[in-house]
């Protein structure tokens, strides 16, 4: 396969290298990743400045491209400009830190997989608990296993997978679960501080004690030491509500 690897932690991130080491054994792997960390930039792209691409001579070998833009920019460039033929698969990760529940909406890692999905390229976003995780290599090996197994199942159009892993050795992982996205609000708090001039400034801070999730959701599974796999659609239409709205007559 022709595989593009990307992330939002930047081209020098350990999680990206762990994936490269595993997948480059049997596939052509091209790394197209942000030149610096671009965490939590969501699905932003660069419209008002040119994108610079610097090909790196990486110690691991292979093709590595550092891009001045966002994770979504990296995937767009990889599909439209840098790879010929188009990639068969895009893998985004391994992210340092989970992208479950509401954090999917902020994540550059998830957005990169979504961007590939928009172009009809199969894709998967992979994230692991921990800052930084201790088991990137095992996470990369597990990702390879998932890709091989999931290749047996044809994914529906406009769908990609969001995978979250506990930061545990493989023998301590309790299982793998296909589950829904948790809908709890993000576990954030805002810290207000004062600078040396007495002016207020604010930091977002993550509250890891914010709920265990409910039911068969990604957050709940991860609390139990289980790998969560959530199918995500690029079609944001709520079809149930759409059918109800069609019952209304709105005249201008």
UniProtKB/Swiss-Prot annotation:
MF terms (GO), sorted A to Z: 5'-nucleotidase activity; metal ion binding; nucleotide binding
Cofactor(s) needed: a divalent metal cation
InterPro entries attached to this UniProt entry: SurE, SurE-like_Pase/nucleotidase, SurE-like_sf
Entry binding sites for a divalent metal cation: 8-9, 39, 95
Subcellular location: Cytoplasm
Keyword Cytoplasm recorded: yes
EC number: 3.1.3.5
Main location: cytoplasm
Gene Ontology CC entries for this record: cytoplasm
Keywords: Cytoplasm, Hydrolase, Metal-binding, Nucleotide-binding
Reaction(s) catalysed by this chain's protein: a ribonucleoside 5'-phosphate + H2O = a ribonucleoside + phosphate
EC top class, as a word: hydrolase
Cofactor, free-text remark: Binds 1 divalent metal cation per subunit.
Role this protein plays: Nucleotidase that shows phosphatase activity on nucleoside 5'-monophosphates.
Recorded family membership: Belongs to the SurE nucleotidase family.
Name of the protein in its database record: 5'-nucleotidase SurE
Species: Desulfosudis oleivorans (strain DSM 6200 / JCM 39069 / Hxd3)
